[in-house]
Design a protein with these regions (language model features):
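A short small-residue
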Residues: 40-45, 120-128
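Acidic/histidine-rich alpha-helical segments that form the ligand environment
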Residues: 57-61, 66-68, 123-161, 180
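Short low-complexity stretches enriched in small and charged residues
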Residues: 43-47, 54-55, 103-105, 143-144
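Secretory/endomembrane lumenal or extracellular ectodomains immediately following the signal peptide
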Residues: 27, 32-48, 57
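A glycine-rich, hydrophobic loop/mini-helix early in the fold
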Residues: 55-83
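Hydrophobic alpha-helical segments and helix-packing faces
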Residues: 51-54, 58, 81-85, 92, ...
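Short, contiguous alpha-helical
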Residues: 2-36, 73-123, 156-193
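Solvent-exposed interaction patches of small proteins and small membrane subunits
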Residues: 46-56, 109-111, 130-131, 135-138, ...
Length: 193
């Protein structure tokens, strides 16, 4: 017979039921509208961010995440179908990596198509809720800095280069950066960071 806490993850201290990724509604919303108007939830207005400002915005956002990972409830979901701050942090880390790779694709090819990425399948496959918050904190900081450095290297004449998603949505490097920065800002808002 086990007592409460015997099945807890030794690194996070969370019970398996607290971190099970199932039960999250898959994201199906097309968020490209955030490039045209301010987000009513997080307040981010992509139109107010010029391409060269993306790098500093990414760094400022990343600087706020370490405090989130130090919370005692970082692995707890606020509601059953809402990611925990830890899961959001894992997602943000992976989004940083994804958008840096998309940026490099646009910079190295003419109007490339981006591979689809299923964020929900990734969360389950990579067991976001079971990851070590201290490790994720370091990885998010490194991924955000790498992405910020890549956006910081974009030359003045390259901000209009394009790439596209499989659904046909076209991004310039500038709008890709704006969209990316909104995603990170929105998720920091989601976790009250």
């Amino acid at each position: 017979m086990t007592s409460p806490g015997d099945s807890a993850d030794p690194q996070t201290g969370f019970e398996p039921d607290d971190i099970e990724p199932e039960g999250i509604e898959p994201e199906s919303k097309d968020w490209t509208w955030v490039l045209q108007k301010a987000c009513p939830d997080c307040g981010f207005d992509a139109r107010s961010v010029a391409g060269p400002q993306v790098a500093s915005g990414l760094r400022a956002n990343a600087a706020r995440w370490p405090a989130v990972f130090k919370r005692p409830d970082v692995g707890a979901r606020p509601r059953p179908r809402v990611w925990s701050p830890l899961e959001y942090g894992c997602h943000v880390r992976d989004v940083c990596r994804l958008f840096e790779s998309r940026l490099e694709l646009i910079r190295s090819q003419v109007d490339p198509s981006f591979e689809n990425w299923d964020q929900d399948a990734t969360a389950i496959a990579d067991a976001y809720g079971a990851q070590d918050p201290a490790v994720v904190s370091r990885e998010l900081s490194a991924a955000a800095e790498s992405a910020a450095a890549a956006f910081g290297e974009v030359g003045d004449g390259d901000w209009a280069r394009t790439g596209r998603r499989s659904n046909g949505s076209v991004f310039t490097i500038e709008t890709l950066g704006q969209y990316f920065l909104h995603d990170l800002t929105h998720h920091l808002h989601d976790v009250h960071g």
